[in-house]
Swiss-Prot record:
Its EC number is 1.11.1.24. The active site is at residue 46. Its main location: cytoplasm. GO terms for cellular component: cytosol. HAMAP family: Peroxiredoxin (MF_00401). The active site is a conserved redox-active cysteine residue, the peroxidatic cysteine (C(P)), which makes the nucleophilic attack on the peroxide substrate. The peroxide oxidizes the C(P)-SH to cysteine sulfenic acid (C(P)-SOH), which then reacts with another cysteine residue, the resolving cysteine (C(R)), to form a disulfide bridge. The disulfide is subsequently reduced by an appropriate electron donor to complete the catalytic cycle. In this 1-Cys peroxiredoxin, no C(R) is present and C(P) instead forms a disulfide with a cysteine from another protein or with a small thiol molecule. This is Peroxiredoxin 1. Keywords: Antioxidant, Cytoplasm, Oxidoreductase, Peroxidase, Redox-active center.
Length: 215
């Protein structure tokens, strides 16, 4: 699987919204990339995921995040499937879907099941500098939790902007954690602070973050 903190591939792709150059059209505009691959068009689990992602599209957009789908199906298969989703479920898919029939991008992302020839159900989140900040892989048999992926995206953005870390089960608005010091004297001083549970665990109120570091 593609590695955390590695560079997202610098490639151009064909999508249902036209060609996309990741570094020009997304990262070059200061946006985050949330790429999710699905095994195949016209399949039950993937259909429910596309409906769910579409329903959360505006929330991702407000965060400055571009949702982009991916599979090895053809562009014509994608178009017909998106039409089918709109006709059957009343949901218009607002984000681009990459057609990767030659499997080039799928292989670059280690997102191809060579045995079946299908794309693996993965998620890749990359910051505006093109660095991959989150990667996850899911079984073919069940769908992703979009609310949890939205929470992870928000946590990644706060971490990236504010240089803080986030505790277990963190939700926007809750306390964040200041990274621990690597110098002994600073560690001794840290333990004396009111919000310090230990020298390595210092909480900070979310509202103390500057507005441009919040989500």
């Amino acid at each position: 699987m593609v590695k955390l903190y590695s560079k997202f591939p610098d490639v151009q792709v064909l999508t249902t919204k036209g060609p996309i150059d990741f570094y020009k059209d997304i990262f070059g505009k200061g946006k985050w990339l949330f790429l999710f691959a699905h095994p195949a068009d016209f399949t039950p689990v993937c259909t429910t995921e596309f409906v769910a992602f579409s329903q959360k599209y505006e929330e991702f957009k407000k965060l400055g995040v571009e949702l982009v789908g991916l599979s090895v199906d053809s562009i014509y298969s994608h178009i017909q499937w998106l039409m089918d989703i709109e006709q059957r479920y009343g949901v218009k898919v607002p984000f681009p879907v990459i057609a990767d029939p030659d499997k080039k991008l799928a292989r670059m992302l280690d997102a191809l099941d060579e045995a079946s020839g299908q794309t693996i159900r993965i998620v890749v989140l990359a910051s505006p500098d093109g660095i991959i900040r989150f990667v996850a892989q899911y079984p073919m048999e069940f769908g992703r939790n979009i609310d949890e992926l939205l929470r992870i995206t928000k946590a990644a953005i706060v971490n990236y902007k504010a240089k803080v870390v986030l505790p277990a089960n963190w939700q926007p608005g809750q306390d964040v954690i200041v990274p621990p010091p690597a110098i002994f004297d600073e560690a001794e001083m840290r333990i004396k602070l009111p919000n310090a549970k230990a020298w390595y665990l210092l909480f900070k109120k979310y509202e103390e973050l500057p507005p441009d570091q919040k989500v």
